[in-house]
C-alpha cells in the first residue's frame, strides 16, 4: 500500500488512511452509487470476483481500481466471503454537498464468521464463529452465532478433540490470541478448514468480569459456566470480535450456555461423514442426506434447530423421552399437525431480525417483518398450550409477553415500507403528530404547485408553461422559445436550454424554501423515530430470543412428527440397558430413494448387546458380517447407526420395533480415501480412524467397522482385522458390527463367546447371482466379486481370465517357485499345504498320509488324552508324514 502523501487527492488520502486501519480486509469505499477498491485490493478483488480492473490517473502513475454497484454489493461480498476474505464496508455518513469532502466511516467489517445479511446467510444453517483459548494441552472454545445471538463455551483436552468439536459445529471462522503459538494455531485452523484471525491477547483477559458486565449479572453461576476459565476467555474474545467488527454493542447476546459433551451422543468427524448426515459422500450435496429427509420444518429457525439436534443427539433419557412424547402426540394427530404448521407460517426469522436491528443493520422492512411475526405469536401459543406433551406446552408459554411490543411496532411501521430509510415514508400516519404535520406540508405542496401553474398560465397566456424540479436548480418555471416574449418582468431567469428558458418567481422561491426545509425535517424526524423503535426492540431482546427459541423447538418437533407419520416410523424404546434390538429396521434415506418406492426395501434385524449385558448371551456383542460385494452389508450397518442416532435425537425410527440401550458414542469406519493434503494413504487414513476408535470407545459405544485391513496385503489385513476384533470383544466389550471379506474372521465365533456370525443371503440362479439383501445367521463362503464385476460392465475377456485365475488360487496351483500360478503358459503343479493362502486352514490335503492324520486328529477325544499319549501320537504322525 502506498504512503499517504500530499500528492494524493483529499479523497484518496481519506481512502489510504481508512485502509491503513484495516490492512487484512478488502476495503469497499463508497463513492456515489459504487463501492470502489484501489491498489492491491483492486487487484485481489477483480481476480476473485472476475470484474473489470481499470486505473485512476495520479500524475504519471496509474492507480489500479475496480468497483461494484452499491445496490448489488451484497452478492459481491458473499462471493468474497466464500473465498475466505474479509470485507470492510466504508460508507458515506453525511449527504454529498454538505462539505468539500464527504465524511466516510467503516460501518462494519464482514468476515466469514461475522455475517448478518439475510441475503448472504443460508437461512437454514447456523453461522458459527469459533474462538479458542489455549493453555498447555487444554483448550477453551466458544461458539458464537452473531446472526442469532447464541453463545456457548466449554473446555476440552487435546487439540484433536478441539478440532472435532469445531468441525462438528461447522465453524466459519476462528479467533486466536496473538500470544498463542503460531504453528499450533495454524495447524488447528488447517485441520478445521476455516480462516483464522489473531486478536490482541487483552481480549482474552479479565473474561469473567467482562462477561458479567455485558450480561448485567453479579455472577455467571446461573448460566452453568463456572469453572471454565479458558472457555470464558474464549467467550469474551468472541464478544469483543463481534463488537469490533459490527461497530455496535451486541445487546442481543443476552445469555451464555455451557458447551458440554456429558449429556450428548458424541459423533466424530469420520462418523458424521460416513453416515452422510448433512452432506453426501459423493459430491458433498445436501440432497440425499439424513437432514434433507428429516427437514419438513416450516420456518428457518426450525430448520437450524433440527440440524443442531442432528449434530448433537442426546444422551439423557429424560430429555429424549420428552421429545419422543411430543413427536408421538403430533404424529398421531394430522389435524393438530396442520394447525401447528399454519400457526408457524406467519412467524418470520425472529432471531436474525432481532440481531440485525440490535446491531444497527436493520431497516424498516425488518421492523415490519418483526411486527408481523410478533403479532402471530399469541395464536401459535394457543395451539401449543392446547397440546398434552410437556415440551409443546412449555414452548407455548414462552411465546407470551410480547403483545405490547407487537402492537407498538404495528402501529408505527407502514404496511409496505421502502427498502432503505433514506427513501422515507415508512412511518404510519397517526404515530407522530409532528411527522404528520410535516408530511402534510410536502403533500399539500403538490396541490400548491398545480395551482401556481394554472394561475401563471392564465396570467401570462403561456399554455405550455410547466413547474418542474431538479436537484441542481430546485423548482422552476419552464417556458419554450416561442413563448419567451410573454414572460413577465418580475420573473428571474435561471437557465437557458436548447428548447427554451427556466425562471423563478419570489413566490416560487418562498415555497421551495418551505418544502425543502420540510423534507429535511421529515428525514431527520423519521430517523429519530426509527431509532426509538429500534431501541424498543433492543429493550425486549431477551423476551424475543426466548420466543424465537420456542418457535424453533416447536417447528423441529413438528418436522419429526411429519416424517414419522408419512413414512411409518415407530417410537423407539430408549432405556439404560446396553442392548440394541432393531426388528425390521430400514435405512431411512435408501428406502426413500428406491425407484420402486419404500415397499421394495428389504428390512433387517440387528440384535446385539455389550459383553456382559443380560441380552449378550442371546445376541452377542460383536457381529461378524460377511457376504458378497453389493449385497448390502454396509447399508445394514449404517442403518443400525442411524436408528440409534434418530432415537437419541428424540425422533421416531424406521423399524417395526426398536429398543436402544443408551449409547455414549457412535464410531463408524466405512470406506476411506487418500488424504493427499496431509500426505496420508487410504490405509493410513483407515488405521488412524481405527486407532481413534480403539482409544476412545467405551462399553456403551456403538462401533461400526467395514472392511478393516483391506488397504494392505492379505496376511497383514487379516491379522490387523482379527486383532482389532479381539480387542473390541475382550477389552472394550461394546456393541460392534464388523463387516469383512476376510472369511477367516468367522473362526472368531469358535474362540470368543460373544461373537456371532451373520451373512447377507444370496441366491444363485444359473450363472446369475441374486442379492436377497437379507441378514441371516451363519457365514459366507464366497464374495462373488467376479459377478459384481460383470454387473459393472468389465469386458468378457477380463472376466474369463479372472475366473481362470480364481480357479488356480482356489485349487492352490503353484509354479516351480512355489508361487500361485496366475500367468498363462506357466507350468503348474498342485501346491503343498505350506503354500495355501488361507491363514487358518482350508483347501485340499497334500497327500493320502496327511488325510489319514487329519482323520485321526478329528477322531480324538482330547478330554481323555493323557500328555504321554499325545506325545506318542505326535511321534507316529511325524513318521507317517516323513
Curated annotation (Swiss-Prot):
Record NCBIfam families: mutS1, PRK05399.1
Transmembrane segments: none
CDD domains: ABC_MutS1
One Pfam family this sequence matches: MutS_V
Gene Ontology CC annotations of this record: cytosol
PANTHER family registered for this protein in UniProt: DNA MISMATCH REPAIR PROTEIN MSH1, MITOCHONDRIAL, DNA MISMATCH REPAIR PROTEIN MUTS FAMILY MEMBER
GO molecular function, one term: ATP-dependent DNA damage sensor activity
Keyword DNA damage attributed: yes
Function per UniProt: This protein is involved in the repair of mismatches in DNA. It is possible that it carries out the mismatch recognition step. This protein has a weak ATPase activity.
SUPFAM superfamilies: DNA repair protein MutS, domain I, DNA repair protein MutS, domain II, DNA repair protein MutS, domain III, P-loop containing nucleoside triphosphate hydrolases
The name this protein goes by in its record: DNA mismatch repair protein MutS
A Gene Ontology biological process term: mismatch repair
Binding site for ATP: 627-634
Family: Belongs to the DNA mismatch repair MutS family.
Organism lineage string: Bacteria, Pseudomonadati, Myxococcota, Myxococcia, Myxococcales
Keyword line: ATP-binding, DNA damage, DNA repair, DNA-binding, Nucleotide-binding
